[in-house]
């Protein structure tokens, strides 16, 4: 696990990830989390997501109720891997600090990541490595198909809660229930 120092994950998050990994493994997708903050009124906001239409996002439908969809932005300030994924990460260019930039090794160039800073690249991990056809990244989140709501068990907390109150940033401005209700 890689985790930025101001992120909180729960036991429920770990249980979700473990179960979802089994479901998603055959598709080469990785269960992901959504970084959230609470505002002064205790409403939950997605830190780095925009409003989307669920039917425009790449997704895998698991049953009549749940799908796993690519979030607009896979940044989650962490990654959580089992042994197999960690081995893949450590034995690939995704663990190289130059990954994405390509300045020292052109084989590590990734246009999606070229402008990421070192901390952002560290959390990306395998998101952009061996992406299944039709997807934007390997990271997917569980969404209730009927309600178009992100499932609570994949929400992780950004402890400072600094973005929802900051009027000078676009981070933390979309209510969690509105992410797929555009």
Language-model features, listed with the residues they occupy:
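Short beta-strand-to-loop acidic/aromatic patch adjacent to the donor-nucleotide binding site
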Residues: 1-8
């Amino acid at each position: 696990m890689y985790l930025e120092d101001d992120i909180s994950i729960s036991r429920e998050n770990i249980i979700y990830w473990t179960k979802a990994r089994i479901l998603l493994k055959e598709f080469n997708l990785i269960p992901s989390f959504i970084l959230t903050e609470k505002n002064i009124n205790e409403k939950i906001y997605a830190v780095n997501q925009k409003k989307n239409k669920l039917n425009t996002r790449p997704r895998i439908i698991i049953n009549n109720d749940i799908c796993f969809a690519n979030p607009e932005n896979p940044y989650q300030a962490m990654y959580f891997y089992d042994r197999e994924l960690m081995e893949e990460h450590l034995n690939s260019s995704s663990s190289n600090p130059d990954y994405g930039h390509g300045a020292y090794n052109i084989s590590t160039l990734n246009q999606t990541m070229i402008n990421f800073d070192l901390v952002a690249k560290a959390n990306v991990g395998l998101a952009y490595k061996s992406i299944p056809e039709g997807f934007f990244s390997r990271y997917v989140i569980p969404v209730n198909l009927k309600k178009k709501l992100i499932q609570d068990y994949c929400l992780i907390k950004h402890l400072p809660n600094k973005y929802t109150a900051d009027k000078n940033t676009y981070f933390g401005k979309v209510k969690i229930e509105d992410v797929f209700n555009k």
